[in-house]
Amino acid sequence: TYFTTNQQYPLGIDLSVYNSSADGRRRPNFDLIAAHQPSVEFIAMRAGQSWGYRDPAFRYYLAEAQRIGVCILPYHVVFPGESARRQMDSFLRILAGVDLASVRLVLDLELDHGQTRSKITQTLNECLRILQAETSRLPLVYSRASWVNEHLSLRDLPELDWWLAQYLPRRSYPAYTPEFPCPPRLPEGLSVWRIHQTSERAPAIGGSGWYMDYDRWNGTRAELLAYFGRVDKQPAKVCPLDGLACPRRKIQPNSITAEQPIAMEVI
């Protein structure tokens, strides 16, 4: 089986239009994603890039992810040489109608476009400021340690939650590449990570395409849900008398109280 590494970390996947066929007819089946074991707890999905591109699959992914009840992270690819305001306005327009308190936004920082460290850091800071003003919290930032070390000045950034990529060397097609064991390599000056993108050539979940990106959450499932403002629903207590769900919260399994006489059939 593929799933032998990182099983203590909640599993996530991330999607873009490249996880659908070119004509849009074959798309990931979210019922299969919902039924998958180990369970997929969160899904990141590309919303757009810069100020002029919307991922055409985003709305489908968003609606389906909402339907199956997973935690959702819309992400936007930042072009560091372009206006932060135009890019974030585009991101927010794409998200029109989305309850921003129920999702976690992500800025994808992996393109330098020949810009200086100072310029890239400045653009990111402006994007952060705009999103914080609009949503009352900072987004996560996706990148990798080597890129951050070369292109960002962490001392000039606020404290952020980081989603970091690190993979094992690719195996030749059609083989799958195992997940990189958590934790990922951290940029210089960082000591914590929030999400680790562990593979870019993992088995596709949901029946579309061959490969898929996998991610792992640094914490428990309960901590993941709390991060998204959710409560982990506990299973209903089972009544020891009839085996049905019991509305009384304090009943103990396999216990019978004096107030609950048992009706016995006389043989």
Tell me what each language-model feature is:
Residues T1-T135:
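Substrate-binding cleft of extracellular glycoside hydrolase catalytic domains
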Residues Y2-D23, L157-I267:
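Functionally critical loop-and-helix segments that line ligand-binding/catalytic clefts
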Residues D23-G24, T116-R117, H151-L152, I205-G207:
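Short, solvent-exposed polar/charged micro-motifs at secondary-structure junctions
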Residues P80, S146-W147, P203:
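Positions that flank functional sites
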Residues V103-P183:
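Catalytic domains of cell-wall/extracellular-matrix polysaccharide-remodeling enzymes
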